[in-house]
């Protein structure tokens, strides 16, 4: 399950593992969820009966991505402390921490009492149109959708011109799937906040790392 960040459906897990779709698989997934190894969610844009299962245990993720295939390299971790390999892990780990602290994020946004669902969404691109992927989507019963971008940085995060364009594309792609009554709030979840600048005005809501541990 560590091979796909967004997770897998029951059918995909059954096909990959050879386990039949039945009580045994259901019990296994339920036990893993109860132990906080995985979480489940309904992917936005798919039938409500569809459930995705996503690995969220940080040790398992780190082991499978960066240790399992380098078991004989005793110095792999220390040799790569400043490499792009572990920098990529920082981003992955921060996103998983966000998934694990959904209730705290709701609290920081001031919507702890609003019924919500957490999801992810992606649409494939075509020759005419670029695709889009959103890894953290909060769909609220008050007709607001928080499109969340999770960014790990060692200082306040700076939004570039190119990134603002990417964010606007994601907003427009998502807007095309919503009802006219729904509005989108671009929400940045970062370690130390968003740096004020020419392109930061696109952000409507912010959540900082410190908010996740209150």
Predicted features, each with a name:
Residues 1-3:
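Short helix-to-turn junction characteristic of helix-turn-helix DNA-binding domains
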Residues 5-16:
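Short acidic, hydrophobic short linear motifs in intrinsically disordered regions
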Residues 18-35:
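Short amphipathic alpha-helical interaction segments
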């Amino acid at each position: 399950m560590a091979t796909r960040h967004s997770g897998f459906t029951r059918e995909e897990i059954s096909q990959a593992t050879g386990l039949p779709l039945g009580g045994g698989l259901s019990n296994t997934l339920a036990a893993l969820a109860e132990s906080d190894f995985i979480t489940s969610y309904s992917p936005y844009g798919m039938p409500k009966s569809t459930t995705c299962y996503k690995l969220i245990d940080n040790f398992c993720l780190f082991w499978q991505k960066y240790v399992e295939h380098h078991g004989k390299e005793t110095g792999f971790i220390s040799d790569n402390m400043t490499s792009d390999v572990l920098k990529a892990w920082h981003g992955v780990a921060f996103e998983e921490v966000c998934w694990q602290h959904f209730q705290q994020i709701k609290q920081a946004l001031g919507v702890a009492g609003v019924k919500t669902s957490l999801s992810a969404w992606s649409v494939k691109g075509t020759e005419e149109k670029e695709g889009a992927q959103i890894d953290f989507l909060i769909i609220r019963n008050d007709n607001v959708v928080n499109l969340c971008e999770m960014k790990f940085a060692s200082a306040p995060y700076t939004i570039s011109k190119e990134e603002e364009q990417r964010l606007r594309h994601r907003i427009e792609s998502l807007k095309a799937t919503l009802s006219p009554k729904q509005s989108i709030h671009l929400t940045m979840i970062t370690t130390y906040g968003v740096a004020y600048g020419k392109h930061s005005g696109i952000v409507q809501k912010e959540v900082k790392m410190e908010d996740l541990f209150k």
